[in-house]
A protein has these predicted regions:
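Helical "lid/coupling" subdomains associated with nucleotide-phosphate turnover
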Residues: 58, 72, 98-130, 136, ...
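Serine/threonine-rich intrinsically disordered cytosolic regulatory regions enriched
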Residues: 572, 577-581
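A short acidic Gly-Thr/Ser loop motif
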Residues: 61-69, 227-234
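Membrane-embedded alpha-helices of multi-pass membrane proteins, especially ion channels
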Residues: 19-34, 541-551
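Interhelical loop segments of eukaryotic multi-pass membrane proteins
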Residues: 30-45, 82-88, 488-498, 554-570
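Helix-loop boundary elements of multi-pass alpha-helical membrane proteins
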Residues: 1-16, 549-571
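Short loop/turn segments immediately following beta-strands, especially the blade-tip
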Residues: 75-82, 241-242
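N-terminal module-boundary/linker segments of secreted carbohydrate-active enzymes
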Residues: 45-61, 65
Length: 582
């Protein structure tokens, strides 16, 4: 039988080609995800997306130290520009993974973590408005703890993921306004976070500070202060009293012409490392270190519920539920942290958090205590009925009494009777609630805290006001929309807009999604399975081609030279100058 080399080579070549095609299909399915093309769609002022005027919605993602929370806000223009109103567009979307924990991860891992959250929050916005809705992913204390290099790499990855896998509005990459895009994905300073929280606290309380510079500007005494304690940091924000903070204009009204100018008259202080998660970790770590210095493998911890056991750095730590001792421990650690950071109080020139009197005067008739301040006091109120009846406006003295009762409760009883009672206290946070209640006293009191007296009852511990959440993300959305509104009526702002904003126009590139099932979770699952099957097919085809090549080489070596060109028996197989039957 004649040697069939050419036909076999054609077959093996085809297998290699099939392997290559399947490999490319696998790569596209596994790593391509949703793709977008750009089409020209009307005109844009270029630069910052807010230069185009008030957006229909704004999405702000709070990338905190304990997880991410995405918020969508609806922006409605007022009857007279530049007035507008802002309200939440549905419930926030939570992601348990802290963004900072994704530092150093691949783009695929970052995508898997944040894209489902962004898709879900996009569903809060009408489909036709998503391409005109800007998104801002802003990180707080957790990301501030990363190095500058880690942050830059993380933000570069996040930017690429959001730009290529969502339809939210972002600055054109062709524009020379790189800082505009960077503003969408960045780590914000603690002072910014605090100011945004203050804006939100006032807005939901009926004090529209975005009306500054108009005849509708609120009166100074109407404003409220904001206190915010998270997992990594704590902030206090308050409009300074007249004569102590540069207040100008009519003594009863806010004289600032813009939010940027108003920020200069607001006392904003943010303290990194004194939030609940960071502070408790440090307290337990130091307690374990002290035990190891004395060659002990067991020790007690005053900030744990009585009998609660936890192992830290190889040391078994048993809670004793001593509330007052816990407060003193936190006060000492807070002062130590301030000394390490070189931060002294402007009021006392000592290493503490004390705010100046001008920030605490009765001009701020009320302060709103947010985030952990609400969660911890609400826990005391619902988990120990009757111990905090004055909630949501208890004094520090009343919180102290309730905290002593809670911390002294046997851990076994806490697990049996308290776990699951408070919707804001998940099981994994329950052991830390004794510490949290003591932290309130330490951070708000007069020893090392902000300076509130034990018997004062002007702090409202709230999660929302009239159904509106009190979170800094709302303040951020207010600030962004305010700039857009002012720019739309010709008021000078800090926005980086192209020169064409005064009359000309430039091409605006709109992103359009392409691909089947590109945006849905089901679509991604289908793509992965298709990718795996294509990859498997490519591997099988390649192995078959290689096996065939090896077999061909063996046959080639065993075949007589004459038979490589002639048929068996040496009979010439040439016909019309070509080889046949091969």
């Amino acid at each position: 039988m004649a040697y069939q080399a050419p036909r076999r080579f054609v077959m093996w070549g085809a297998l290699v080609c099939i392997a290559c095609v399947l490999g490319l299909m696998a790569r596209a399915a596994l790593f391509g995800g949703v793709a977008y093309i750009t089409t020209t769609d009307g005109s844009s002022n270029g630069g910052d997306v807010l230069c185009d005027g008030l957006p229909p919605f704004v999405v702000v993602v709070d990338a905190g130290s304990t997880g991410c929370r995405a918020h969508a806000f609806k922006v409605t223009p007022g009857t007279v520009a530049p007035a507008f109103t802002l309200e939440p567009a549905g419930a926030r979307v939570k992601l348990e993974t802290p963004l900072a924990s994704l530092a150093g991860k691949s783009e695929g891992e970052v995508s898997d973590a944040i894209v489902p959250m962004l898709e879900e929050i996009a569903a809060r916005v009408p489909a036709k408005d998503v391409p005109n809705t800007p998104v801002y992913v802003w990180a707080t204390a957790g990301a501030r703890a990363l190095s500058e290099t880690q942050q830059q790499t993380l933000w570069s990855t996040v930017t690429n993921v959001v730009r290529t896998q969502t339809q939210f509005k972002l600055p054109n990459t062709a524009d020379s306004f790189q800082s505009s895009e960077e503003n969408h994905f960045r780590t914000i300073a603690g002072e910014e976070e605090g100011f945004f929280a203050w804006l939100a606290a006032n807005y939901v309380s009926g004090v529209d500070v975005t009306a500054v510079g108009t005849s509708d500007a609120p009166r100074s005494e109407e404003t409220v202060g904001a206190l915010d304690v998270g997992g990594g940091s704590a902030q206090i924000v308050s409009l300074l009293a007249q004569g102590n903070g540069g207040q100008s204009g009519n003594e009863n009204s806010i004289g600032s012409s813009s939010l940027d100018e108003l920020a200069k008259n607001v006392y904003v202080k943010s303290y990194l490392g004194v939030g609940a998660a960071h502070a408790e970790r440090r307290a337990r770590t130091e307690a374990a270190a002290d035990a190891l210095k004395n060659y002990k493998k067991e020790t007690t911890f005053p900030c744990g519920f009585k009998g609660e056991v936890e192992e830290v750095d190889g040391v078994t730590m048993t809670g004793t539920g001593e509330y007052d001792a816990c407060v003193e421990l936190i006060q000492r650690l807070t002062a130590t942290k301030m000394k390490e950071d070189g931060v002294k109080s402007v009021a006392t020139s000592e290493y503490n958090l004390r705010a100046p009197d001008s920030a605490l005067l009765p001009i701020n008739k009320k302060f709103l205590g947010m985030s952990l301040l609400f969660h911890a006091t609400h826990f005391l109120h619902v988990a120990f009925p009757g111990s905090l009846d004055s909630f949501p406006e208890p004094s520090l003295a009343e919180i102290g009494d309730a905290g002593r009762k809670a911390c002294a409760t046997e851990w076994e009883r806490i697990q049996r009777d308290v776990d699951g009672v408070d919707e804001n206290t998940p099981t994994d946070r329950l052991p830390g609630r004794c510490f949290d209640t003591a932290l309130i006293q330490a951070l708000l009191g007069t020893e090392t805290g902000f300076g509130f007296g034990d018997d004062e009852q002007r702090i409202s511990f709230v999660d929302d006001v009239d159904g509106k959440g009190v979170e800094w993300t709302m303040g951020a959305a207010l600030s962004l929309a305010h700039r857009a509104a002012q720019h739309s009526v010709g008021v000078e702002t800090t926005l980086a807009c192209a020169a064409s904003s005064s009359g000309g126009s430039s091409t605006y590139k709109k992103k359009v999604a392409v691909g089947i099932g590109a945006k849905s979770r089901t679509g991604r699952t289908i793509r992965r399975w298709v990718g795996f099957l294509c990859a498997a097919g490519a591997l099988i085809a390649l192995v078959a081609a290689l096996a065939g090549a090896v077999e061909a080489d063996k046959m080639w070596r065993l075949t007589k030279p004459a038979e490589r060109i002639m048929g068996p028996g040496g009979i010439a197989m040439r016909k019309r100058g070509s080889l046949s039957n091969f």
